[in-house]
């Protein structure tokens, strides 16, 4: 039986009990999730992406969050071009090297924006043409077809999108390192490509499907190799092991949550001085809240209701990416939640709880106790820059616990 990604993530951090986790293990886990090979998150820097590309990927990322998936794939890349020359003519060169093995290219789009939005914008957009340039003897040059711009009809006046799926698909399967395109305009000469990139911000968006499962064996192996290198250099003490206890998820750093009556909930200050996660790991020790407040906060990913400390609830830690230097790459999220379900289920179950019908029946007749387990699992989505500076969105399905209940 195939294990779910959430199980793999928890098995790496081992947070079900008192854990002993070091910086190397955390770094290697994040590196594997981002599919990085060797880059040091504290060294590499990139130029700033164009505003249009950033806004496009931001909208896609928000769609992933809202829909918890995307029908076009679980991996999206946005690539900005460099200017090259082929057969004496300028071309746009996109870096498609280093894609995942066994990756399925689902769709590719070439985006182009018209800088001037005047009365002639629609006519100019109709005059723009794009075609792929074959730099491999086994491929063929293709004229790209335009895709109708969804949403606001006015977008068609200054935004052009071409279907580049076939060209990118061929480049990937021919092991090409670059996808090359030429953009022209009917009855008119195009401006120099360097200026065109600056003003029209063309970029290539590629949707793919990949097997997103955390490789725990590889993570542990790479962690040991990192430690071995450090020992060889005599720097064993540069990374310490940290002891910490799993804690109910809450956020002591955020502003107090306001209730409908305008009052604020005070936040717990009972954080152990030995807790390595202090400052970005969260702990709560709250008194029983009013019923209406409980209902409002029950689905808050950071809030655990402690009416009964032994009740079925979600527990874990929030790992800050900034604390480990990965904020240089990762745009969103700021933290990674590693949580699990913990607590006991009453026997017999009470109807006031959120138990399933099966749990209610089992609590009456079965010898085995009812299990505290996830009632739903959510995706973990990364929006980041990869080692080559390309903007990427990765979707790991069923990696986060939405809520826990007695099942």
From Swiss-Prot:
Main localisation: secreted
UniProt-listed PROSITE patterns: TGF_BETA_2 (PS51362)
GO cellular component, one term: extracellular region
Signal peptide annotation: 1-18
Entry function: Required for the migration of axonal growth-cones and distal tip cells (DTC) along the dorsal-ventral axis of the body wall. Acts cell nonautonomously and independently of the classical daf-4, sma-6 or daf-1 TGFbeta receptor signaling. During axon migration, facilitates long-range repulsive guidance of unc-6/netrin by enhancing unc-5-unc-40 signaling at the expense of unc-5 alone signaling, probably through direct interaction with receptor unc-5. Involved in cell-cell contact formation in sensory rays in the developing male tail, via a pathway involving plx-2 and mab-20/semaphorin-2A.
Subunit structure: Interacts with netrin receptor unc-5; the interaction is direct.
Protein name as annotated: BMP-like protein unc-129
Species, as recorded: Caenorhabditis elegans
């Amino acid at each position: 039986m195939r294990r779910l990604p959430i199980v793999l993530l928890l098995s790496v951090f081992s947070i079900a009990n008192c854990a002993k986790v070091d910086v190397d293990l955390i770094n290697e886990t994040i590196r594997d999730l981002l599919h990085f090979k060797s880059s040091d998150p504290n060294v590499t820097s990139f130029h700033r992406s164009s505003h249009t590309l950033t806004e496009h990927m931001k909208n896609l990322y928000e769609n992933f969050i809202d829909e918890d998936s995307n029908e076009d794939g679980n991996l999206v890349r946005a690539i900005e071009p460099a200017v090259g020359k082929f057969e004496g003519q300028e071309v746009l060169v996109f870096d498609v090297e280093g894609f995942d093995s066994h990756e399925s290219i689902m769709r590719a789009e070439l985006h182009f924006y018209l800088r001037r939005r005047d009365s002639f914008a629609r006519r100019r957009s109709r005059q723009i043409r794009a075609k792929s340039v074959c730099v491999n003897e086994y491929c063929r040059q293709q004229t790209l077809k335009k895709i109708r711009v969804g949403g606001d009809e006015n977008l068609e006046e200054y935004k052009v999108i071409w279907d580049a799926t076939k060209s990118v698909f061929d480049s990937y399967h021919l092991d090409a390192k670059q996808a090359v395109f030429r953009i022209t305009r009917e009855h008119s000469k195009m401006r120099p490509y360097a200026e065109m990139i600056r003003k029209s911000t063309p970029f290539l968006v590629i949707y793919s499907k990949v097997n997103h499962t955390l490789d725990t064996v590889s993570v542990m192996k790479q962690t040991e190799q990192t430690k071995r290198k450090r020992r060889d250099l005599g720097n064993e003490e540069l990374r310490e092991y940290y002891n910490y206890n799993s804690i109910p998820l809450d956020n002591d750093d955020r502003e107090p949550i306001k209730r409908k009556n305008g009052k604020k909930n005070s936040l717990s200050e009972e954080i152990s001085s030995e807790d390595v996660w202090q400052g970005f790991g969260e702990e709560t020790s709250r008194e029983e809240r009013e019923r209406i407040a409980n209902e409002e906060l029950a689905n808050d990913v950071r809030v655990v209701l402690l009416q009964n400390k032994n009740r079925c609830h979600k527990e874990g830690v929030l790992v800050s990416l900034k604390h480990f230097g990965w904020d240089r790459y990762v745009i969103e999220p700021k933290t990674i939640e590693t949580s699990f379900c913990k607590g006991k289920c009453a026997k017999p179950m009470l109807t006031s709880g959120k138990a399933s019908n099966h749990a209610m029946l089992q609590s009456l007749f079965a010898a085995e106790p009812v299990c505290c387990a996830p009632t739903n699992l959510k995706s973990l989505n990364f929006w980041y820059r990869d080692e080559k500076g390309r903007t990427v969105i990765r979707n790991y399905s069923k990696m986060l616990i939405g809520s826990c209940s007695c099942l």
